UniProtKB/Swiss-Prot annotation:
A GO term, aspect molecular function: structural constituent of ribosome
Cross-referenced InterPro entries: Ribosomal_eS32
Name of the protein in question: Small ribosomal subunit protein eS32
Note: Initially thought to be part of the large ribosomal subunit. Crystal structures show eS32/eL41 to be a small ribosomal subunit forming a bridge at the interface of the 2 subunits.
Length: 25
Protein backbone atom coordinates (compact mmCIF):
# COMPACT_ATOMS: atom_id res chain seq x y z
CA UNK A 1 0.00 0.00 0.00
CA UNK A 2 2.74 2.45 0.91
CA UNK A 3 4.69 1.68 -2.26
CA UNK A 4 1.63 2.48 -4.37
CA UNK A 5 1.26 5.91 -2.76
CA UNK A 6 4.93 6.70 -3.21
CA UNK A 7 4.80 5.68 -6.88
CA UNK A 8 1.89 8.03 -7.50
CA UNK A 9 3.74 10.93 -5.88
CA UNK A 10 6.92 10.24 -7.83
CA UNK A 11 5.01 10.20 -11.12
CA UNK A 12 3.56 13.63 -10.39
CA UNK A 13 6.92 15.01 -9.30
CA UNK A 14 8.58 13.70 -12.46
CA UNK A 15 5.95 15.37 -14.64
CA UNK A 16 6.35 18.71 -12.87
CA UNK A 17 10.14 18.53 -13.23
CA UNK A 18 9.86 17.90 -16.99
CA UNK A 19 7.67 20.99 -17.40
CA UNK A 20 10.23 23.15 -15.59
CA UNK A 21 13.00 21.98 -17.90
CA UNK A 22 10.95 22.81 -20.99
CA UNK A 23 10.28 26.29 -19.64
CA UNK A 24 13.97 26.86 -18.96
CA UNK A 25 14.72 26.12 -22.61
Amino acid sequence: MRAKWRKKRVRRLKRKRRKTRARSK
